[in-house]
Amino acid sequence: MLAAVLVLAACSKGLPEASPADERRAEAARPTDALLAQKYERACLTCHASIASKAPLTGFVAHWQVRLQQGMPTLVAHVRDGFQGMPARGFCNDCSDQDFAALIVFMSQPHNSKE
């Protein structure tokens, strides 16, 4: 879903590259709210847990910092309307703006998981 919000800074020079361990953490992370977790798994996980997708990885804070500086209203608009590689609504047609904001917050935070 937020895969597109993601592409914009992931390719920027100077940002650290995600590692296979970062990718494994992204694959394992899930929101604690069950409904949000379902939406994340259905709409966000495929792109945001794959280095190959060029979307910012869930939990890989370095790629999210640049985006977060734009402010949540801008990020939500990018998800809702589509932006660069991010498809409109991020494949989550039943997501509200509040869902998008909660998903962005979840994906932009570090997640600890066992590898």
Predicted regions and their residues:
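Sec-dependent signal peptide recognition
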Residues: 1-4
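Bacterial signal peptide processing site
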Residues: 11-15
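Post-signal peptide N-terminal segment of mature Sec-exported envelope proteins
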Residues: 19-43
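Extracytoplasmic/secreted proteins, especially bacterial periplasmic and envelope-associated proteins
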Residues: 35, 39, 63, 74, ...
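The canonical Cys-X-X-Cys-His
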Residues: 40-50, 103, 107
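Gly/Gly-Pro-rich "capping" loops immediately C-terminal to redox-active cysteine motifs
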Residues: 49-77
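Axial heme c-ligation environment in periplasmic c-type cytochrome domains
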Residues: 55-56, 78-115
